[in-house]
Amino acid sequence: MKKYVIPKDFHELDSTEIDIWLLQGGDRLLPGMSDEAGEGALKYLTDLGVQVRLGTRVTGYDGKFATTKSGEKFRTRKLIWAAGIKGNSIEGIPESSLERGNRICVDSYNQVIGVEHVYAVGDIAIMKSEELPYGHPQVAQVALQQAINLANNFNNQLKNRTLRAFKYKDLGSMATIGRNRAVVDLPSWKFKGFLAWMMWLAVHLFQILGVRNKLVVMLNWMVSYFTYDQSLRVIIRNENNEKE
């Protein structure tokens, strides 16, 4: 955007005055992936001109300055906050069944601990074990696999069959860091770069329902790739200018 979109469509803006900072509270990027993926993401972002600060927690923002835990201030009018999720409190769920972020503790069958006949799957649920003391990663595959296993257990329960405890099958993780740049963690192989980016595109294209929708998305991607332009834009009007 800084290199192609702003100089082309917003001549009144000086793109050289735009700085992009990424402030990460942890000591590495992509903590849910391998060290290789985190290091690759850091290199790609740095190559793109993003100034990355690790171990930096933002504690406040007043509309003009973002303040960190150490007291350092960053002047900015545009702040994107990506600090994770927190579940809403649900009446009837005891506090003893809640973990950090209001995640609900469940057993290996996804039943809420301390509450009978109530189940939770996906991001809202946390299933602890010796191998996973902090629960499963909060990704779509966990939710899908838990939902399928729970549905099968409901059928088994109706037929008086043995219930099956949930066991997560890690199919791998991917993250894209812009054009031609991505990182992929597979159970037996970790790689990055253009091949990883193509794999990310293929997997996400495959997940789209309908042949027509797949073709439309693929065409939009091709246009964006070859023209360095984005077909989707959000126009944000200045409220003060509208009143004037």
Per-segment meaning from a language model:
Residues 25, 123, 179:
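Cofactor-binding loop segments of dinucleotide-utilizing enzymes, especially the Rossmann-like FAD-
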Residues 54-65:
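A conserved short coil-to-beta-strand element within the FAD-binding core of flavoproteins
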Residues 1-56:
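Rossmann-like dinucleotide-binding cores of NAD(P)H-dependent redox enzymes
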Residues 65, 73-145, 152:
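FAD-site-proximal beta/loop scaffold in flavoenzymes
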Residues 151-244:
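C-terminal, flexible cofactor-proximal segment of oxidoreductases
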